[in-house]
From Swiss-Prot:
Ranges of Polar residues composition bias in the record: 215-235
GO cellular component: host cell membrane; membrane
InterPro entries: DnaJ_domain, J_dom_sf, Papo_T_antigen, Papo_T_antigensf
Region Disordered, annotated ranges: 215-237
Phosphoserine PTM positions: 257
Lineage, uppermost ranks: Viruses, Monodnaviria, Shotokuvirae, Cossaviricota, Papovaviricetes
Source organism of this protein record: Murine polyomavirus (strain BG) (MPyV)
Topological domain ranges for the Cytoplasmic compartment: 1-394
Name recorded for this polypeptide: Middle T antigen
TM region(s), chain numbering: 395-415
C-alpha cells in the first residue's frame, strides 16, 4: 500500500473520499466512501462533473495498482486464475455468503496460536501460508499490506489493538475482492482430509479422537455428531456403534494379546470388545459426560436403514470467542508431584527431568518461556561442571609436573654428589 499512487494523489483521493489519512489501505471503508461520494458528485444529482471524473480516475488507478502489487512479485506457484476488472466486484463475503465468518476462522483460539505450522483450511490460515510462500518463492524479504493480506501484515500496517483485531481483520477481508486474495475457494469449502497415519501421530487431541462432549450432544442435529478437527473436514453423520469404538474417551493404541483389558467399559459399559483385543492406554484424559441414549441409537428402524448422509461441516462461532483468551478469574495452578532423586543424576539432567514432569501442569502459553528458562539453567549448570572438571585436570597436571621436576632435581643432585666422591 505504500507504493500505490504518489503522495499527492493519495492526499487528493482521501480528500475526495473525505477520509482521514490513517484509513489509507482499508479497501472496505474506502469503497464505501467512494460510493457515497459518487452519489453526491454525480452530475445528475447536482454534483461537479470535473470532481466526479477526477474521483473515478484516482479510484480506478488505486484498484489497478493494488491488483498489480502481488503480480509484480513474480510467479508464486499457488495463485488461482485471475479475473479482469469486471470481476473485482465479487467480494470475499459475497463469495462465502452468510457463513463467511465461520469460513474466515475455523477455530479462533487455535488458529491465532498456530502461526507457523497449521493444517487448517480457513481463510486466516491460508493467508498466513501465502505469506511464507511469498517470502520463500519470490525472495521477498519484507512484505507490506497489499502484497500480502495476512493478519500480521494487517496489524503491522494499521497497528490494531489485540482485543479487537480479529473482528476488524474479518471485516477488512470481507470487503476485499476474492480475486485479489489468490485463494482457492474449493479448498476452503472442502479442506483436505489428513491421512490416518498423521491423525494417529498427532500430539493434540481433537474432538474426533477424544469422544463426544456435552456441547456436541446439545448442538448436534438429526441425531448426528459434530466433530471439528483442524485441517480435516468435520462431517456430521448419524451415530452408530462402530463410531464409539473409533471415538474413545481415551487416546488409545489397539493391539492383540491376552488377557483382555477393558478400558472403555468404565465409560461406556454397553461396548463389548472381543476376547483377544486389548486397548493400551497412551495418555489419560478427563472423561467426558456420558452420551445421552437418544443420540446413540436411531429412533426407528426406517431411520436406521437410511444411507449415511453427509452434511455441511460445522465451525466454531467466531464472535466474541477471542475474548476468552484473557480469563477474568485466576486459573488455579496444579502442584506437580515431587521428584524422586536418583543416583548419578547430573544437575542439568535433573532440571530437564523436573521440567518434563511439570509439562502436564503448566499452561500452554507459558511452555515456551518455561523451556527457555530451563535451557538457560541447564547450560549454566553444565558450564559450571565443565569448568570444575577443567580446573581439576589443570591441578592434576600441575601436580604431576611439579613431582616430575622434583624427581629430576633429586637425580641431578645425586649424580653431582657421586662425581665428587
Amino acid at each position: 500500500m505504500d507504493r500505490v499512487l504518489s503522495r499527492a494523489d493519495k492526499e487528493r483521493l482521501l480528500e475526495l473520499l473525505k477520509l482521514p489519512r490513517q484509513l489509507w489501505g482499508d479497501f472496505g471503508r474506502m469503497q464505501q466512501a467512494y460510493k457515497q461520494q459518487s452519489l453526491l458528485l454525480h452530475p445528475d444529482k447536482g454534483g461537479s462533473h470535473a470532481l466526479m471524473q477526477e474521483l473515478n480516475s484516482l479510484w480506478g488507478t488505486f484498484k489497478t495498482e493494488v491488483y498489480n502489487l502481488r503480480m509484480n512479485l513474480g510467479g508464486t506457484g499457488f495463485q488461482v486464475r485471475r479475473l479482469h476488472a469486471d470481476g473485482w466486484n465479487l467480494s470475499t463475503k459475497d463469495t462465502f455468503g452468510d457463513r463467511y465468518y465461520q469460513r474466515f476462522c475455523r477455530m479462533p483460539l487455535t488458529c491465532l496460536v498456530n502461526v507457523k505450522y497449521s493444517s487448517c483450511s480457513c481463510i486466516l490460515c491460508l493467508l498466513r501460508k501465502q505469506h511464507r510462500e511469498l517470502k520463500d518463492k519470490c525472495d521477498a524479504r519484507c512484505l507490506v499490506l497489499g502484497e500480502c493480506f495476512c493478519l500480521e501484515c494487517y496489524m503491522q500496517w494499521f497497528g490494531t489493538p489485540t482485543r479487537d483485531v480479529l473482528n476488524l481483520y474479518a471485516d477488512f477481508i470481507a470487503s476485499m475482492p476474492i480475486d485479489w486474495l489468490d485463494l482457492d475457494v474449493h479448498s476452503v469449502y472442502n479442506p483436505k482430509r489428513r491421512s490416518e497415519e498423521l491423525r494417529r501421530a498427532a500430539t493434540v487431541h481433537y474432538t474426533m479422537t477424544t469422544g463426544h462432549s456435552a456441547m456436541e450432544a446439545s448442538t448436534s442435529q438429526g441425531n448426528g455428531m459434530i466433530s471439528s478437527e483442524s485441517g480435516t473436514p468435520a462431517t456430521s453423520r448419524r451415530l452408530r456403534l462402530p463410531s464409539l469404538l473409533s471415538n474413545p474417551t481415551y487416546s488409545v493404541m489397539r493391539s492383540h494379546s491376552y488377557p483382555p483389558t477393558r478400558v472403555l467399559q468404565q465409560i461406556h459399559p454397553h461396548i463389548l470388545l472381543e476376547e483377544d483385543e486389548i486397548l493400551v492406554l497412551l495418555s489419560p484424559m478427563t472423561a467426558y459426560p456420558r452420551t445421552p441414549p437418544e443420540l446413540l441409537y436411531p429412533e426407528s428402524d426406517q431411520d436406521q436403514l437410511e444411507p449415511l448422509e453427509e452434511e455441511e461441516e460445522e465451525y466454531m462461532p467466531m464472535e466474541d470467542l477471542y475474548l476468552d483468551i484473557l480469563p477474568e478469574e485466576q486459573v488455579p495452578q496444579l502442584i506437580p508431584p515431587p521428584i524422586i532423586p536418583r543416583a548419578g543424576l547430573s544437575p542439568w539432567e535433573g532440571l530437564i527431568l523436573r521440567d518434563l514432569q511439570r509439562a502436564h501442569f503448566d499452561p500452554i502459553l507459558d511452555a515456551s518461556q518455561r523451556m527457555r528458562a530451563t535451557h538457560r539453567a541447564a547450560l549454566r549448570a553444565h558450564s559450571m561442571q565443565r569448568h570444575l572438571r577443567r580446573l581439576g585436570r589443570t591441578l592434576l597436571l600441575v601436580t604431576f609436573l611439579a613431582a616430575l621436576l622434583g624427581i629430576c632435581l633429586m637425580l641431578f643432585i645425586l649424580i653431582k654428589r657421586s662425581r665428587h666422591f
